[in-house]
Amino acid sequence: MRAACVAVALALLSACTTVSEPVRPQARALPDTERPVTRPGATPRERIVEIATQEWTRWGGQVVRLGRDDTSCVTYSPVPAPELPAPLPEIPEAQPLSPAVAGVPAAATTDTESKTNGNPPPVASCLSFPDGTGMEATPLGCSLARRYWSIVGEAPGCRQVTQGSWAWSAVFISWVLRKAGLDERQFLTGQSHSMYVVDARDGILPRPAFHIEPVPAMPRPGDIICAGRGRDRYLEDIAEIGFGTTPMHCDIVVGVDPATRVVRAIGGNVQQSVSMEEIELGDSGRLDGITNSHMPWLLVMRNDLQ
């Protein structure tokens, strides 16, 4: 009888100490002892904002303005503007022959006046950093970015960090949220933004830290704002976001100024650094997908934590 009681007690103890597996596959983080320091008594939402801001400061405080005039420009950077190859001289355009002289029917002529697909031309005075330049191409930037990759078990070299195939914006957010204390019941890390966006959309976690709200919306500090990229730049239906397959970009909101209609958000791999984006809101005074074509916002991941 006593032996049976001991066996039952051991079984119960084993059940209590068993670590449950996450609800979806998640890369195992590399060993890491870094513990960012935040204000005593800070709430989880406040810790997210504080840690994101600390990282932005470590990267030198780069600022990017997303203007109501549909521009996206670096307004401050700790590194000088990149030395880019000079543009090739323009070749004088030959006077086109008339359709009759060219021996082509007039109806067959092609309109080649615009090849910009309706996008505004680049502004010559607008500072930007192509891949392989900016803070991520410095020894400090490389060492900082590699920390973020460790949260998903990767250890890329400095050359990889500067390549587009190793875009690190999603692992930056994953790193910040995990360091802020969110556990696997609240948030799962991912190499792609669409992984944790789909988690929040589908409500798969036991104690989700976020839920999805489509734009237009007014975000709050601690929320995460996301836009489609590439082929899904103007995605309209959140239901179409595929897990790990839809290209996206997301930033952590750290400040909102309704009076000036500006949202401040910090993101990784923005102009090759951790940058603060000063997002100028449109006439509605809310975040939307039409005010700036460089970042057509799609959704807000609402932070449900204190």
Name each model-derived stretch.
Residues 24-185:
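N-terminal capping segments
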Residues 269-306:
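Low-complexity, Gly/Ser/Thr/Pro-rich intrinsically disordered linker/tail segments
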Residues 13-15:
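C-terminal motif of bacterial Sec signal peptides marking the signal peptidase cleavage site
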Residues 188-271:
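...with weaker cross-activation on analogous glycine-rich loops/strands in unrelated enzymes
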Residues 1-6:
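Bacterial N-terminal signal peptides that target proteins for export
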Residues 64-65, 187-189, 237-238, 276-278:
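Short, solvent-exposed loop/turn and secondary-structure capping segments
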Residues 17-19:
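Bacterial signal peptide processing site
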